[in-house]
């Protein structure tokens, strides 16, 4: 046996020696190549036998590419080893890596804004600001705004090779400091900031540094890999290619053989088409995102990655930059302490080894994470309280009289020691000697401390610019060539089109259906060419086809607006210039225009009976295709100009209206007033319709004479509409349309280049964190009566249909299981922590228990105090603080809480008690000073993330629930705010309530404030359910008893230790299955017995029930919803103010264009013009109301889903509130329009006629508005709503009776005429104004007789039209309510 072993060993060693010899020979051959070729050539071990192959990394075959990516993926498995090897390689040849030292001196930052009540965006304030702007422009008054100081005269140095932790309470100026240091601040900054002695003007800071925002702004439809890969393609490799070339040159000179693993990685990451993919895979691996790399990012309405993964994605997207300085803002929100430690440690390894510079702001760093940092910057009230080595920070605070207690995290101590409320507990002396030490005094003391003196001394000596490495600071504006940036944007645009392919397919099918509808209405068997009047029918068909193309493009505005936040972020960070974004969004959409035009023209042209000449067929196609491009470009320009969904949805219909009025169909060129004739000549629709008309009516089929007229019939038809009748005008019109395509796309690009988001409004009280006053209410419990309840659950399984991405990877199971046999109990008076690594299923379990899942498959039993859970009852006695803080943006903190309390507290609670209770809860979570602060939109305006989190908790607490689920209540909070929240939660539990919290990164103090722990591992399995114990003794005892688990270190955070020792990596290393160990433990059996005990109803008890489905009566629900909607509308100027401005402009436009036409009776064309005015106003203002209400509905609908899940109100009461609040605004809009138009157009001034006009316009605007609301309720998103709405706008347009009167509509479609609301509007408007007019036209026919004979309108049936328009308004409002009740498009 020994001989055999020796022979085998010798054989293996001989084989190994041969492989080494072969590798040496290949390396020797490689070394002989020129440096340029060697940079592109590497030795790659090919699977499965590891055969070495010489490959060109720039031109890889598919199999080589896969092998390369597999090989370099292994590099990320040990990031520190890789970095050390790389550093060793560059050190061997004497290459010095670039470093950056950042200095800031006498730095001041301030903002300018309206504050207090003037800061609230009410309609009145908006009009006041507009008037002030006008008076300021005329130098009559001065701008009344306040300067809000953020940072005061701060100075410091951030050195390379060192990790700097930025601490400070919210509102202290952390984000402003990071933005200023990164060179991306939009506020007023004074003082000096230098990189290696160079001012910001001497280099490109956006490419020399990377700012990682605390807000996760991504395109929801892209996957994680695609998001990071796009960033990598745009950022490029920086100086790394030059480094590689120099490295290879020196190694060749010194005859040094590089490490093969490092060599192939560097070459793959800096050259070839796969370089972005290599960097992307590496970053995803080290940040733990490789497990969700092919999952879409998602958003509130589209299921995607978790909040913690989204936060890591934000980090990944930015650290692909080759910049040497990192400024990272709250990157740990939503991450567990173990994951945070790993990420920060990975960054630390990079910074330490490669000489980078990093400033990272963290909210609740665990002690072990805190110790990874070298330096500390502590901000408070806009001043630097400490800036220096971590080792001296406790020494400094001890010198001013404060000491950090044992088992207290130093980071938590630092954030609390400057707070007026928390400072006293850290005072070294006796309570009698304590006096509050203001932040200014501490900051002054730091200047005298030896660390502060050393910084001042160093700042006094300028940095020697000669020491600056040439590659340290970027001087080129963009990372790669314009060609590469354009390719990256084109590829991304194609991806987005694929992900939204359903939308485009749906739109094409819809267009096909409308085309079938149109061609069967204008069918050739009913279309004649024997009179000018019949020629008008053909003109109407051309006009309708043109407007169909125009309206179909409206749906593009929603998706375009949704992408703007990502564009502005990436543009400002110099990912790419705006034109590389705008050009693909134009070019890639050309096939969509081609498809839409093809569907329309190919279906309708010959069926309607246009000129059969095939050349004229393709000419019509060309006009409509180019017009489609014009309208898409116009709407993109509007989106970029307004940058707001509501304003854009108003501007779109407004532009359509102007161009439609001036196109020559509704009002002929001869009838256009001389002061508006310029509008006729600049209207793109005029050129489109003129080209269509010339193409059709100059055809051979129209070249015939009719009795009583001279010249061909086609020219007579053109002349009757005042169109330009020469053939040349077809090509002139095509040229004009192409010019508009270019113009609007250029304007779109200019807007994207120079415009930014509107400045947010700052509330004075919300701005100051330390405005929160000390309150003794922090120790109070809630006083309202409630029923203590427990919840048990057994063998819970939750699964979803297997995603396509998993199937593509070979997963054959039909369902993906996210929770596996989960059992437990949550009891009254017991505070339970639900913990686990990111992706363990914590939020999923809470969603299942709370009944919030809208998809998937749930198995198992859930009982409430022994009785089976009934969701209707459970929603009444439970509260759920969701991870995403979803609130109505246009109400204040106090109003949000009052609304929740009003609808969720029992009807027996009177208003005074309810108000007192709300104030008590505000004091409990310390948001009383913020009661008048506007909530706002996350990341845009209003409350900061930590205040929003406290509001989320308060909204549930005011419901006085018996059971409360809290999903990451301390996520996004600093240590002090987290302590406030935990005190409030602890007080809540002490009143006898059942509270469960998922929690990340708890400090020792917060973790040990919980009574029990429910611990889950990745894969949705429980591994510990039981008591934590005093100083976590029970938890530690359980895990230390497991073989292979390392003992906890003294002073180590038990929660962090627990997550580390139970991680998947540790399970694999120790071969331990913690889930199986738990299920075989005595603790598991004890829990099973407890579940069994609690699952049986107590003797003499009864199942909880309520006499009504909701806490409040229907009328109260409606009043509460109406009250909140009133506040939301009053504070939504983009919606209301723009609507009224639009109405005024439209009224003046109509009044001046149709001036005095209501008094004329000369001929029938005059009546057609009057009806055209009515038709245009009805369609334009109606579509504007319908399209502008939809974004407002979608913003509130997400909040509605949360509130409905809590059983606050019925869908019908909410819908009625939404409908009712529109009536006063629509009525005022109607008054404005009717008074102006009625007077200027010259309708007959009688009370009855004016009231009829008012009546029909009011209900027309009402049913259009309610139709828009109904469509928002029936569709999953704004884009789909716009697409579906557009179809009905066009159908209503067709059957309105204007393009083709009822008597000319084919009999098989005439039934729909009676179902068209616009037809009844035109009937009512025309009949009420002219149905009793007996004046005669030039041909002797009276006005009333012509109306009855041509249109079929009868004066004595006016009341039918009135009933019809009222009925449509009621119908659409009812369907809106029904849609909210029946459909839930939120995917959870």
Swiss-Prot record:
Localization terms from the record: Membrane
GO molecular function: ABC-type transporter activity; ATP binding; ATP hydrolysis activity
Domain (ABC transporter) ranges: 135-406, 791-1043
Domain ABC transmembrane type-2: 484-697, 1116-1330
Membrane topology: Multi-pass membrane protein
InterPro entries assigned: AAA+_ATPase (IPR003593), ABC2_TM (IPR013525), ABC_trans_N (IPR029481), ABC_transporter-like_ATP-bd (IPR003439), ABCG_dom (IPR043926), ABCG_PDR_1 (IPR034001), ABCG_PDR_2 (IPR034003), P-loop_NTPase (IPR027417)
Stretch list, region Disordered: 1-24
Segments traversing the membrane: 503-523, 541-561, 590-610, 621-641, 646-666, 675-695, 732-752, 1136-1156, 1167-1183, 1223-1243, 1250-1270, 1280-1300, 1305-1325, 1357-1377
GO cellular component, one term: membrane
Coiled-coil stretches noted in the UniProt entry, renumbered to this chain: none
Pfam families per UniProt: ABC2_membrane, ABC2_membrane_7, ABC_tran, ABC_trans_N, PDR_assoc
Binding site for ATP 2: 836-843
UniProt keyword list: ATP-binding, Membrane, Nucleotide-binding, Repeat, Transmembrane, Transmembrane helix, Transport
Keyword Metal-binding annotated: no
Function description: May be a general defense protein.
Protein name, UniProt field: ABC transporter G family member 52
Gene: ABCG52
């Amino acid at each position: 046996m020994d001989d055999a072993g020796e022979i085998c060993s010798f054989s293996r060693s001989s084989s190994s020696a041969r492989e080494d010899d072969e590798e040496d020979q290949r390396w020797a051959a490689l070394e002989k190549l020129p440096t340029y070729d060697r940079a592109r050539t590497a030795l790659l071990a090919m699977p499965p036998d590891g055969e070495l192959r010489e490959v060109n990394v720039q031109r890889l075959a598919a199999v080589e590419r896969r092998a390369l990516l597999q090989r370099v993926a292994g590099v990320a498995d040990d990031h520190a080893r890789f970095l050390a090897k790389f550093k060793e390689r560059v050190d061997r040849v004497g290459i010095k890596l670039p470093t950056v030292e950042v200095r800031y001196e006498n730095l001041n930052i301030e903002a300018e804004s309206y504050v207090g009540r003037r800061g609230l965006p009410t309609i009145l304030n908006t009009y006041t600001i507009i008037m002030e702007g006008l008076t300021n422009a005329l130098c009559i008054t001065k701008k009344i705004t306040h300067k809000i100081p953020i940072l005061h005269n701060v100075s410091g140095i951030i050195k390379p090779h060192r990790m700097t932790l930025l601490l400070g309470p919210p509102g202290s100026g952390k984000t402003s400091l990071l933005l200023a240091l990164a060179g991306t601040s939009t506020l007023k900054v004074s003082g000096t900031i230098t990189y290696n002695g160079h001012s910001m003007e001497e280099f490109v800071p956006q490419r020399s540094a990377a700012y990682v925002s605390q807000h996760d702004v991504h395109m929801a439809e892209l996957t994680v890999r695609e998001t990071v890969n796009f960033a990598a393609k745009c950022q490029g490799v920086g100086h790394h290619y030059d480094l590689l070339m120099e490295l290879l040159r020196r190694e060749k000179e010194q005859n040094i053989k590089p490490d093969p693993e490092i060599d192939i990685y560097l070459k793959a990451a800096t050259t070839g088409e796969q370089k972005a993919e290599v960097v992307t895979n590496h970053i995803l691996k080290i940040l733990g995102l490789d497990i969700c790399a092919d999952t879409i990012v998602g958003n509130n309405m589209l299921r995607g990655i978790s909040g913690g993964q989204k936060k890591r994605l934000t980090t990944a997207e930015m650290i692909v930059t080759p910049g040497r300085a990192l400024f990272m803002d709250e990157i740990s929100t939503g991450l567990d302490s173990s994951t945070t430690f790993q990420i920060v440690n990975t960054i630390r390894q990079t910074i330490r080894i490669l000489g980078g510079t990093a400033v990272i702001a963290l909210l609740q760093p665990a002690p072990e994470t805190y110790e990874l940092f070298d330096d500390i910057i502590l901000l408070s009230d806009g001043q630097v309280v400490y800036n220096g080595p971590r080792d001296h920070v406790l020494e400094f605070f001890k010198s001013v009289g404060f000491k950090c207690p044992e088992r207290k995290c130093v980071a938590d101590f630092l954030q609390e020691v400057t707070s007026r409320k928390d400072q006293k507990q850290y005072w070294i002396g006796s309570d009698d000697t304590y006096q509050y030490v203001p932040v200014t005094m501490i900051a002054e003391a730091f200047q005298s401390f030896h660390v502060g003196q050393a910084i001042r001394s160093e700042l006094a000596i300028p940095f020697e610019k000669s020491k600056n490495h040439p590659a340290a600071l970027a001087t080129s504006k963009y990372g790669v060539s314009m060609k590469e940036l354009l390719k990256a944007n084109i590829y991304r645009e194609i991806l987005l089109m694929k992900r939204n392919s359903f939308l485009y397919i749906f739109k094409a099918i819809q267009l096909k259906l409308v085309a079938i509808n149109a061609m069967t209405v204008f069918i050739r068997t009913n279309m004649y060419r024997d009179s000018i009047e019949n020629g008008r029918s053909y003109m109407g068909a051309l006009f309708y086809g043109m407007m169909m193309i125009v309206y179909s493009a409206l749906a593009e505005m929603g998706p375009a607006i949704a992408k703007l936040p990502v564009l502005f972020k990436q543009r400002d960070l110099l990912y790419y210039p705006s034109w590389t974004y705008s050009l693909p969004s134009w070019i890639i959409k050309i096939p969509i225009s081609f498809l839409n035009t093809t569907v329309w023209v190919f279906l309708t042209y010959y069926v309607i009976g246009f000129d059969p000449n095939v050349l004229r067929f393709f000419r019509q196609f060309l006009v409509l295709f180019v017009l489609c491009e014009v309208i898409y470009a116009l709407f993109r320009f509007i989106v970029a100009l307004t940058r707001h969904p509501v304003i854009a949805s108003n501007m779109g219909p407004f532009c359509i209206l102007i161009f439609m009025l001036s196109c020559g169909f509704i009002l002929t060129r001869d009838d256009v007033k001389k002061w508006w004739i310029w509008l006729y000549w600049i209207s793109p629709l005029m050129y489109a319709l003129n080209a269509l008309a010339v193409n059709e009516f100059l055809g051979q089929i129209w070249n015939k004479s009719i009795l009583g007229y001279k010249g061909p019939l086609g020219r007579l038809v053109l002349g009757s509409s005042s169109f330009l009748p020469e053939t040349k005008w077809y090509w002139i019109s095509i040229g004009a349309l192409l010019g508009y395509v270019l113009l609007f796309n250029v304007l779109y690009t200019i807007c994207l280049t120079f415009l930014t988001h509107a400045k947010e409004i700052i509330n004075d009280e919300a701005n100051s964190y330390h405005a929160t006053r000390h309150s003794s209410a922090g120790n109070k419990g809630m006083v309202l009566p409630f029923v203590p309840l427990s919840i048990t659950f057994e063998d819970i399984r939750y699964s979803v249909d297997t995603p396509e991405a998993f199937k593509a990877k070979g997963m054959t199971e039909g369902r993906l299981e996210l929770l596996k046999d989960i059992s437990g109990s949550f009891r009254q008076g017991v505070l339970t922590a639900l913990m686990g690594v990111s992706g363990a299923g914590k939020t999923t379990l809470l969603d299942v228990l709370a009944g919030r899942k809208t998809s998937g498959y749930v198995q198992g039993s859930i009982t409430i105090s022994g009785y089976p859970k009934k969701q209707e009852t459970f929603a009444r006695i439970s509260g759920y603080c969701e991870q995403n803080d979803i609130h109505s943006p246009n109400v204040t903190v106090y109003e949000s809480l009052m609304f929740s309390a009003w609808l969720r507290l029992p009807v027996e609670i009177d208003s005074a008690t309810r108000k007192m209770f709300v104030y008590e809860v505000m004091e409990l979570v310390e948001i009383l000073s913020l009661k008048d602060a506007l909530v706002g939109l996350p990341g845009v305006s209003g409350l900061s993330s930590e205040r929003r989190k406290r509001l989320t908790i308060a909204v549930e607490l005011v419901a006085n629930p018996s059971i409360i689920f809290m999903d990451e209540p301390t996520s996004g909070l600093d240590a002090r705010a987290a302590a406030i929240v935990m005190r409030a939660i602890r007080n809540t539990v002490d009143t006898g309530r059942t509270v469960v919290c998922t929690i990340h990164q708890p400090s020792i103090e917060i973790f040990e404030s919980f009574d029990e722990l429910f611990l889950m591992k990745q894969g949705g399995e429980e591994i510990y359910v039981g008591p934590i114990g005093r100083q976590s003794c029970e938890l530690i005892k359980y895990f230390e008893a497991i073989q292979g688990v390392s003992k906890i270190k003294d002073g180590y955070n038990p929660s962090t230790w627990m997550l580390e020792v139970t991680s998947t990596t540790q399970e694999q290393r120790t071969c331990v299955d913690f889930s199986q160990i738990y299920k075989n433990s005595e603790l598991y059996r004890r829990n099973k017995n407890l579940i069994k005990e609690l699952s049986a109803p107590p003797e003499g008890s009864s199942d909880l029930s309520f006499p009504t489905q909701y806490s409040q009566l229907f009328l109260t629900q409606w009043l509460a919803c109406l009250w909140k909607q009133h506040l939301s509308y009053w504070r939504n100027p983009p919606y209301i103010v723009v609507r009224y401005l639009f109405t005024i402009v439209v009224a003046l436009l109509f009044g001046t264009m149709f001036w005095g036409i209501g008094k004329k009776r000369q001929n029938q064309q005059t009546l057609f013009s009057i009806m055209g005015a009515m038709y245009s106003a009805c369609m334009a203002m109606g579509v504007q109301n319908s399209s502008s209400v939809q974004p407002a509905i979608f913003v509130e609908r997400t909040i509605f889903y949360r509130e409905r899940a809590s059983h606050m109100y019925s869908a019908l009461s909410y819908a009625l509130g939404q409908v009712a609040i529109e009536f006063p605004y629509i009525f005022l809009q109607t008054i404005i329009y009717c008074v102006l138009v009625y007077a200027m157009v010259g309708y007959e001034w009688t009370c009855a006629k004016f009231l009829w006009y008012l009546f029909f316009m009011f209900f027309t605007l009402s049913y259009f508005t309610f139709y828009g609301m109904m469509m928002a309720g029936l569709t999953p998103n704004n884009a789909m709503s716009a697409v579906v709405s557009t179809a009905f706008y066009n159908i209503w347009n067709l059957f309105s009776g204007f393009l083709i009167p009822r008597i000319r509509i084919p009999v098989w479609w005439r039934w729909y005429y009676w179902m068209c609301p616009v037809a009844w509007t035109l009937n009512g408007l025309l009949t009420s104004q002219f149905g009793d007019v007996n004046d005669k036209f030039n041909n002797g026919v009276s006005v009333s007789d012509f109306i009855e004979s041509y249109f079929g309108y009868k004066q004595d049936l006016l009341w039918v039209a009135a009933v019809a328009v009222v009925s449509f308004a009621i119908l659409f409002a009812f369907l809106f309510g029904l849609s909210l009740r029946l459909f839930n498009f939120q995917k959870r």
